[in-house]
Swiss-Prot record:
Its main location: cytoplasm. The gene is rnhB. It comes from the Bacteria. This is Ribonuclease HII. Residues 10-199 form the RNase H type-2 domain. Endonuclease that specifically degrades the RNA of RNA-DNA hybrids. The lineage of its organism: Bacteria, Pseudomonadati, Bacteroidota, Bacteroidia, Bacteroidales. A divalent metal cation binds at D16, E17, D108. It comes from Parabacteroides distasonis (strain ATCC 8503 / DSM 20701 / CIP 104284 / JCM 5825 / NCTC 11152). PROSITE patterns: RNASE_H_2. It catalyses: Endonucleolytic cleavage to 5'-phosphomonoester.
Length: 199
C-alpha cells in the first residue's frame, strides 16, 4: 500500500523522471501534489503498470491533483551537462511550473540538486512507496512516450514506438546500420566495438 504523504500538514510534491537510461530523446520529469485524502487502488510503481493502465491513470491524476507539471530537458542539453544533472534540471523545471508552491519535495532516487528554499527528501524506489512519486512517474513516462511516438514517425527505422529510445538490440542495430539522428544523445552513442560485441 503506497503512502499518501511523508508528513501530513504540509504541501508535499512527488517528483520522478523518465528516459534517463535512453540513447535517444529528451529526459522528462513530473512533479505532482496530491490531496492528503487521495486514494487510487490502481496507482502503483508505473514501471509495473501496463501502458494501457498508465494512460488510464494519467487523466485521473491530472484531474484530482492539487497541482502537477512536466519538465523537459533536450538531448542537446543532456550532452552539455550530463544525464544526472539533466534529470535534476527536468525536475526543477517541473517544480517551478507548479501552480501551488510545495513546502517539501519527495524525490525518487538517492540524489538531488536542492531546489531553492524548498526542503527535500530522496527516496530510493520512491515510486513504489509514495503516491505522489508514483503519480509523477506515470505523468513523466506517458508524456515522454507520447514524445517518442511522435519522433518515431520521423525516424521509423529506430523502432522508437517499441523501445522509446532505450538501448534494445533492435535500436543498437539500427544505430549501427543508419548512424545516429539529431535526437540521439551524442554522449550516449555506443562505440562501434560495443555494437559489434552486442553490449
Amino acid at each position: 500500500m503506497l503512502l499518501p504523504y511523508m508528513e501530513t500538514g504540509r504541501i508535499e510534491a512527488g517528483c520522478d523522471e523518465a528516459g534517463r537510461g535512453c540513447l535517444a530523446g529528451a529526459v522528462f520529469a513530473a512533479a505532482v501534489i496530491l490531496p492528503e485524502d487521495f486514494k487510487n487502488e490502481d496507482l502503483n510503481d508505473s514501471k509495473q503498470l501496463s501502458e494501457k493502465k498508465r494512460y488510464k491513470l494519467r487523466p485521473v491524476i491530472e484531474r484530482e491533483a492539487i497541482a502537477w507539471a512536466v519538465g523537459i530537458v533536450s538531448p542537446e542539453e543532456i550532452d552539455k551537462i550530463n544525464i544526472l544533472k539533466a534529470s535534476f534540471l527536468a525536475m526543477h523545471r517541473a517544480i517551478e511550473q507548479l501552480k501551488v508552491r510545495p513546502e517539501h519535495l519527495l524525490i525518487d532516487g538517492n540524489r538531488f540538486t536542492p531546489y531553492p528554499d524548498i526542503p527535500h527528501t530522496t527516496v530510493v524506489k520512491g515510486d513504489g512507496k509514495y503516491l505522489s512519486i508514483a503519480a509523477a512517474s506515470i505523468l513523466a513516462k506517458t508524456y515522454r512516450d507520447d514524445y517518442m511516438n511522435e519522433l518515431a514517425l520521423e525516424y521509423p527505422a529506430y523502432h522508437w514506438l517499441d523501445n522509446k529510445g532505450y538501448p534494445t538490440k533492435v535500436h543498437r542495430e539500427a544505430i549501427r546500420t543508419h548512424g545516429i539522428t539529431p535526437y540521439h544523445r551524442k554522449t550516449f552513442t555506443l562505440l562501434p566495438e560495443q555494437l559489434t560485441l552486442g553490449f
